[in-house]
C-alpha cells in the first residue's frame, strides 16, 4: 500500500496529527518550524500558525481550544483569538530538554514525554497531567519519549522510547491511570529505521511510523510480528493517526530535518502530510478532561 500526498508543506519535523471530529479537520505540528497546521480534508486546504517556541504535540480541550506541549511545558491555546496560556511545567525540566510526543489516555489524562536536544541518552522522562491539574512523573531514564496509545478493550498501554528500538506493553488501570508490568512486545531491526509515533486500531493492532524507514508498519503485538506496511515517499516518517468521518483514514506526518540535498531532490514531497485508506478504523482522540 502506498501513502498519498495531502499537503505539500516541507515541514522540518512534521508531527502530532490529531483529528478533530467536531470541526472536521486535522491538526498537526512542525516541531522545529514552531508551527501549528490545520488541514481541511474537504477543501484540501492546509494553513499554519507560527509560534515563538517549538510546538510538539496536541490534545483537544474544547471546540476552539487545544492543549499544546511546547518546548518547556503544557499550554492552552485559544484558536479563536490566537492567545496562549502556560498551564504547567515540570519542576525538573532542564533547558537542554524539550517535550516530544503526547496523547490523552481513555479517561482524558494527558501523557507527554521529553527528549534531549543534544542527543543525550536517558536524560528525559514521561509525565502524566492528571484531571486535577497535578503533574506526575511516570518514568525517568528515558532517551526519546515517543509513540504511545491505549488498548481500550484490554486495558493495555503501548509505549516507545525510540533508541531502544522496542514497543513496550504495560498493564493499564483506567481508574487511576497507573501502569505496571512492562513487557517488550516487538523489537525493530536497525535496518528498519527508528520507531517514532504510533497509533492503535479497533482490532488492537499497532501502526508505527519508522523514522529513516520510509514506512508505517502494521504490528500485531500479540503474535509479535509485522502484518503489513504503508510505503511513504519520504525517508523520515514521524507519526500517524486515524481521522476522517469514518476514522479509516490514516494521516501520516514526515520530516526533512536530516535529509541530504540528494534525498531532498529525490523526495520532493518529504515534510508533507500524507494519508492512506484502511479497512479497519481507529478511535476518536480523547480530549483533555481536566481543569486548566
Swiss-Prot record:
Cofactor binding annotation: Binds 1 divalent metal cation per subunit.
SUPFAM superfamilies reported in the protein's UniProt record: Calcium-dependent phosphotriesterase
Entry's Gene Ontology BP terms: L-ascorbic acid biosynthetic process
Binding site for a divalent metal cation: 15, 146, 196
First-listed, main subcellular location of the protein, grouped into a coarse class: cytoplasm
Top-level enzyme category: hydrolase
Disulfide bonds: none
Taxonomic superkingdom: Bacteria
Alphabetical keyword list: Cytoplasm, Hydrolase, Metal-binding
Transmembrane segments: none
Enzyme Commission numbers on file: 3.1.1.-
GO cellular component: cytoplasm
Cofactor(s) needed: a divalent metal cation
Alphabetized InterPro entries for the sequence: 6-blade_b-propeller_TolB-like, SGL, SMP-30
Keyword Metal-binding (UniProt): yes
Single GO term (MF): gluconolactonase activity
The family this protein is said to belong to: Belongs to the SMP-30/CGR1 family.
Protein name (database record): Putative sugar lactone lactonase YvrE
Organism: Bacillus subtilis (strain 168)
Gene transcribed to yield this protein: yvrE
Amino acid at each position: 500500500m502506498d501513502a498519498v500526498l495531502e499537503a505539500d508543506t516541507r515541514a522540518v519535523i512534521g508531527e502530532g496529527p490529531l483529528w478533530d471530529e467536531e470541526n472536521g479537520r486535522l491538526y498537526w505540528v512542525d516541531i522545529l518550524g514552531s508551527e501549528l497546521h490545520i488541514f481541511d480534508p474537504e477543501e484540501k486546504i492546509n494553513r499554519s500558525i507560527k509560534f515563538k517556541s517549538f510546538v510538539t504535540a496536541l490534545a483537544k480541550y474544547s471546540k476552539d481550544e487545544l492543549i499544546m506541549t511546547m518546548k518547556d511545558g503544557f499550554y492552552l491555546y485559544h484558536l479563536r483569538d490566537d492567545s496562549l496560556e502556560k498551564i504547567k511545567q515540570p519542576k525538573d525540566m532542564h533547558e537542554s530538554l524539550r517535550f516530544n510526543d503526547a496523547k490523552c489516555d481513555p479517561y482524558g489524562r494527558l501523557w507527554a514525554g521529553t527528549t534531549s536536544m543534544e542527543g543525550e541518552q536517558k536524560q528525559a522522562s514521561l509525565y502524566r497531567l492528571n484531571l486535577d491539574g497535578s503533574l506526575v512523573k511516570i518514568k525517568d531514564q528515558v532517551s526519546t519519549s515517543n509513540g504511545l496509545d491505549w488498548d481500550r478493550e484490554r486495558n493495555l498501554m503501548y509505549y516507545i522510547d525510540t533508541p531502544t528500538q522496542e514497543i513496550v506493553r504495560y498493564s493499564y488501570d483506567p481508574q487511576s491511570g497507573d501502569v505496571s508490568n512492562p513487557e517488550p512486545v516487538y523489537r525493530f531491526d536497525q535496518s528498519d529505521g527508528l520507531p517514532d509515533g504510533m497509533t492503535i486500531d479497533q482490532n488492537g493492532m499497532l501502526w508505527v511510523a519508522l523514522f529513516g524507514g520510509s514506512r508505517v508498519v502494521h504490528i500485531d503485538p500479540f503474535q509479535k510480528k509485522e502484518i503489513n506496511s504503508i510505503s511513504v515517499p519520504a525517508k523520515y516518517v514521524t507519526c500517524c493517526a486515524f481521522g476522517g468521518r469514518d476514522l479509516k483514514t490514516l494521516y501520516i506526518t514526515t520530516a526533512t530535518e536530516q535529509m541530504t540535498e540528494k534525498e531532498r531532490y529525490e523526495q520532493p514531497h518529504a515534510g508533507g502530510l500524507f494519508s492512506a485508506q484502511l479497512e479497519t478504523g481507529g478511535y476518536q482522540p480523547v480530549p483533555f478532561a481536566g481543569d486548566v
